[in-house]
């Protein structure tokens, strides 16, 4: 390392230590330990590796995090990239630091495709154990995204996209604006380099004139009026970050030149009453723009952000946005969750708890093993605008925009949701799919005889409601299968003239199952037919079976009655024209009639091919391909459509390149008509160009 590099490291370390004079010795020890462990390791940039953990620690120090988090930041890569053990960290720096380092390590290096969702799941679950883990990971990601220039373009875009879709929204939901804005701008730079440069140049050219305008015409006028009322305030202006400016042009369909509020004025006062007094003063000085006032003091955001926002028409007809808040609100707005987890000595981090939305997110993904479902739940919890409604008792409830009374019912309690029979909004009866609006007073009407239906899945907005409904329906379906299984078993018992106990014992001799319930489910689901079960118990006792002679058509109503296999090349489903090929080992192999793999069989052994009428009930797997213009939220929108159509996603794979996304899904459908309905809905999703069935 050059002497200049060593000096820079020493300066950064001194800067870090200056934040924690009482714990400087411990932090110095952690730095020396990490430096020794990483040894000669280099970053992709060619710099000494120790620069990275030091940068992560400095960012967390800016947020005012406790000294344990800073030590964990310095050590966060030692478990994964060096020979350091958990016990070694625990012995040298304490159990809480060791757990933090382990928490970050457990999240692992994010991989793509099938493992991506599982890593996100680990990220959220680790965060629930100690919210400092997510702040460590966000700071880690921020430092890494700044060095994306060292990678190939494809990898740069993948990491930038993930940063924009997951990490920046997480920072937003946790209220850590300083990290959120930087993550978005760096990701924006690599995802849309041309647009980034246009916005950067536009801000550079516009800022000077706007600053002069605010200093000359706006701030002096406001300051003079505040002094008249004896209000002590700090007045400053700040620039919107590049991505938010570009996003505004896309959202509103306007040109960059039409964005007039790239600079905003922030007024910080001592008390809440002063905030409202300042608001009145501003509205008396300048004309407010209708619909541009938001009171986040009375109605805080879910991440506890509070401020008054108003946009006014100031001198020379220019639009100016004001944010008014107290110092305490300002601290929370800048540092978000970090301002709540400044731990005292000996205090257990878990005592601080987590935000309710984070708990709900953990609950929604904890038991999920479906990668697409994990991603859907995660993204739906990160990307949403809020709507504020009230219960009849006056309790405030915050929900995603587009939520319904059913979402509110499940937000209140699972049992309220499961027995939701109707709703009133502002005293009027509304349908269950009514879209709630801010300010609505909503009363949920319950009925003990009412239960969820599949239809609810088509309109609920929150992942909590969707998961609770699915859980109920799954349980209900299981009970139905058990009841049907009991009925079939009783019919077999009567037919054979055996006692229940004797029948179960005879079945156990021939069929392997762990519990009687498992057997009942197999019978109820038609995984094993009553005829086959009787043959297994009494091989010589065969049921009379009507033979279809002189017919080349095979009617399949119960797939468990005949040995068969669905061809993986075309995956036929009920409603397709299907041909079955008789084979020695696999039984009847089912193909879609136009399948190219049938050509040789039809030419050489036509007698082995039978026409098949597949009339079985249940779900069948098939593949579809979706080609679309890539955008944030695309995967979430498509998986939501599939889920709401009553289909389950078995697997999915997404490839993106040059703004185009190609997504392959294996889905479960009832029949061809069901599949066509799903594909029609997918084609209506914004940006989708092609949705077709996929044959291999």
Swiss-Prot record:
Sections of the chain in a coiled coil: none
The keyword NAD belongs to this UniProt entry's keyword annotation: no
SMART domains assigned to the protein according to its UniProt record, in alphabetical order: HDc, RelA_SpoT
Keyword 4Fe-4S: no
Cofactor: Mn(2+)
Ranges for domain TGS: 383-446
Domain (HD) ranges: 49-145
Reaction catalysis annotation: guanosine 3',5'-bis(diphosphate) + H2O = GDP + diphosphate + H(+)
Lineage top rank: taxon: Bacteria
GO molecular function terms noted in the UniProt entry: guanosine-3',5'-bis(diphosphate) 3'-diphosphatase activity
E.C. number: 3.1.7.2
Keywords assigned by UniProt, alphabetized: Hydrolase, Manganese
GO BP annotation list: guanosine tetraphosphate biosynthetic process
ACT domain segment(s): 623-696
Family listed: Belongs to the RelA/SpoT family.
General function of this protein: In eubacteria ppGpp (guanosine 3'-diphosphate 5'-diphosphate) is a mediator of the stringent response that coordinates a variety of cellular activities in response to changes in nutritional abundance. This enzyme catalyzes the degradation of ppGpp into GDP. It may also be capable of catalyzing the synthesis of ppGpp.
Name of this protein: Guanosine-3',5'-bis(diphosphate) 3'-pyrophosphohydrolase
UniProt organism field: Aquifex aeolicus (strain VF5)
Lineage: Bacteria, Pseudomonadati, Aquificota, Aquificia, Aquificales
Gene name, Swiss-Prot/TrEMBL: spoT
């Amino acid at each position: 390392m050059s002497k200049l590099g060593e000096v820079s490291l020493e300066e950064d370390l001194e800067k870090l230590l200056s934040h924690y004079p009482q714990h400087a010795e411990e932090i110095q020890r952690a730095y020396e330990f990490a430096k020794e462990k990483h040894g000669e390791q280099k970053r992709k940039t060619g710099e000494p590796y120790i620069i990275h953990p030091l940068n992560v620690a400095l960012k967390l120090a800016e947020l005012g995090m406790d000294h344990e988090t800073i030590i964990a930041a310095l050590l966060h890569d030692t478990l994964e990239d060096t020979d350091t053990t958990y016990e070694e960290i625990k012995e040298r720096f304490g159990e809480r630091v060791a757990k933090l380092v382990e928490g970050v390590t457990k999240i692992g290096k994010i991989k793509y495709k099938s493992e991506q969702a599982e890593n996100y799941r680990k990220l959220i679950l680790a965060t629930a154990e100690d919210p400092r883990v997510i702040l460590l990971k966000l700071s880690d990601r921020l430092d890494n995204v700044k060095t994306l220039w060292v990678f190939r373009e494809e990898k740069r875009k993948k990491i930038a996209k993930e940063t924009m879709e997951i990490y920046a929204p997480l920072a937003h939901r946790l209220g850590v604006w300083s990290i959120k804005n930087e993550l978005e701008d760096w990701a924006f730079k690599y995802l849309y380099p041309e647009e980034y440069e246009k916005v950067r140049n536009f801000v550079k050219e516009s800022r000077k004139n706007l600053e002069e305008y605010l200093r000359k015409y706006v701030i002096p006028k406001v300051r003079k009026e505040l002094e008249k009322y004896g209000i002590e305030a700090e007045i400053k202006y700040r620039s919107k970050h590049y991505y938010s400016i570009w996003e505004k042009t896309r959202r509103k369909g306007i040109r960059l030149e039409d964005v007039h509020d790239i600079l905003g004025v922030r007024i910080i006062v001592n008390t809440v009453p002063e905030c409202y007094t300042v608001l009145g003063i501003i509205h008396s000085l300048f004309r407010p723009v209708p619909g541009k006032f938001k009171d986040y003091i009375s109605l805080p955001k879910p991440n506890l952000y509070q401020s008054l926002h108003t946009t006014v028409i100031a001198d020379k007809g220019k639009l100016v946005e004001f944010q008014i808040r107290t110092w305490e609100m300002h601290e929370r707005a800048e540092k978000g969750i970090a301002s709540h987890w400044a731990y005292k000595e000996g205090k257990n981090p878990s005592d601080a708890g987590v935000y309710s939305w984070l708990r709900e997110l953990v609950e929604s993904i904890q038991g999920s093993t479906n990668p697409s479902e994990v991603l859907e739940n995660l993204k739906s919890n990160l990307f949403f605008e809020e709507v504020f409604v009230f219960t009849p008792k006056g309790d405030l409830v915050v929900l995603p925009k587009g939520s319904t009374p059913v979402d509110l019912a499940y937000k209140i309690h699972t049992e309220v949701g499961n027995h939701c029979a109707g709703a009133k909004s502002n005293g009027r009866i509304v349908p269950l799919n009514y879209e709630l609006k801010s300010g609505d007073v909503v009363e949920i009407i319950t009925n003990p005889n009412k239960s969820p239906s599949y239809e609810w899945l088509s309109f609920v907005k929150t992942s909590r409601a969707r998961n609770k409904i699915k859980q109920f329906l799954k349980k209900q379906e299981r009970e139905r299968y058990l009841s049907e299984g009991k009925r079939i078993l009783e019919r077999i018992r009567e037919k054979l003239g055996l006692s229940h106990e004797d029948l179960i014992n005879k079945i156990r001799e021939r069929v392997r199952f762990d519990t009687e319930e498992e057997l009942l489910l197999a019978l109820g689901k038609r995984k094993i037919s009553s005829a086959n079960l009787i043959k297994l118990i009494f091989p010589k006792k065969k049921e009379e079976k009507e033979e279809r002679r002189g017919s080349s058509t095979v009617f399949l109503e119960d797939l468990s009655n005949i040995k068969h296999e669905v061809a993986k090349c075309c995956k036929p489903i009920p409603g397709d024209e299907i041909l079955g090929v008789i084979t020695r080992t696999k039984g009847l192999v089912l193909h879609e009639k136009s399948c190219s793999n049938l050509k040789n069989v039809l030419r050489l052994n036509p007698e082995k091919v039978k026409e098949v009428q597949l009339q079985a009930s249940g779900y069948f797997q098939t593949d579809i391909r979706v080609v679309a213009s890539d955008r944030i939220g695309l995967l979430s929108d498509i998986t939501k459509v599939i889920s709401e159509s009553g289909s389950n996603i078995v697997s999915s794979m997404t490839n993106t390149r040059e703004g185009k996304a190609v997504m392959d899904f294996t889905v479960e459908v009832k029949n061809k008509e069901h599949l066509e309905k799903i594909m029609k809905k997918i084609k209506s999703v914004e940006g989708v160009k092609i949705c077709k069935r996929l044959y291999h």
